Amino acid sequence: PLLAPFYGTWQVYKGIDGEHTHRNRWRYALDFHQVEKGRSYTQDGSRLSDYLCFGRPVLSPAFGTVIRLRDDLPDNQPGSIDLKNNWGNYIILQADSGVFVLLAHLMRGSIRVKRGDRVAPETIVAACGSSGRSPQPHLHMQVQQHASLGSSTLPLHLVSSLIQRGDTPIQFQLVASPSEGNSVRRAVEDHQLAAAVQLPIGRTLSYSVTGADGACHEEELRVDVSLLGQMRLLAENGAAAAFENQNATLAFYDRQGKSNELLDLWCLALGLTPLSSDAARWEDAPPAKLLPMSLMQRSVVAVARPLGAGIDSRYEREWVEAEGVWKQMGDHQLHIANRVLRARTVAILSPTAGCISLMLECCGKSMQADLTKYGQIADLGVPRWESAVDTENSNRANS
């Protein structure tokens, strides 16, 4: 998986299996350029400087090491190509995963790295150019088997991206394979939103949980780390879910242990949470066991889907200005045996207190969990502390 190798919004100029050059063993490649109002240039497009992407920073798409590069070829004037040096100026990186990544058609003299340099996804490595087989400025990216120039390509996809197809709303995609004409932007972490779901080791979250029968009880979740370094959110009865926070995304997985409605609600409502404030819509497929199903319903799922079933979950998020919180809403559908089990979740996220409220509606029943206090478990040199929460904001935002 690769991050988009640029700042801002670019468009896929040529996608996988694109005509002319993205064919046969070079089929898995993406070309990017910038477009405004359907044009990739200003003025009359006769000069390289007219093109929106020309000279823009090119970023490393992954952690890795610079293996090969070339930086001396001239940039073609618009409409011209260099067939002797197809790739133009280029950088080949070996990603930490072992594969090789080619960034091509770079601007002459713009490469900022040298062989052997370590790079990270935020490292500016060069500038977009028009060298090689490039009739207009653009950036070519491919994943390949070997370090040699022109090596066979491998399937590639982008992670944590904001994708727009035509006039449709922008959608966050954890894993994306954008097509020609799609607009692509790297999801950039919003620090306030990230703070709202920050889960450091030793954090405790105490909720007042109201079940479908109206009964209310207190329950605590806490954050711990396993012997192997896996971050986990733990319930009082030992139920647990692992999570990772990287590439501007909080993601929960590996739900283990006993049944726990509060932890399951948390994972259903917040299991995939992009930390970019520009991410207003996204989809996921969490496991069916997170839904509060009856024994009969679970039996039907087990028979119909013995290898496991995923929920069709669609999320939207908005900022509630009056309350100073984010409202993250999920619509969930499980299709089993010609029937559809529907559920709705709402999570209220405060920049200071975190997830202050969770709500679930499913099969005519409801569940509400309101944060009453949050704190930190004592550690050597770290004192224990707790802070109470005013739940009025969450109740108003939920209404």
Summary of predicted features, one role per range:
Residues R112-K114, S130-P137:
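Short glycine/proline-centered loop/turn elements that form peptide/ligand docking sites
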Residues P1-K37, T42, V340-R342, I348-P351, ...:
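Non-catalytic extracellular/periplasmic "stalk"
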Residues S208-N393:
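N-terminal accessory interaction module
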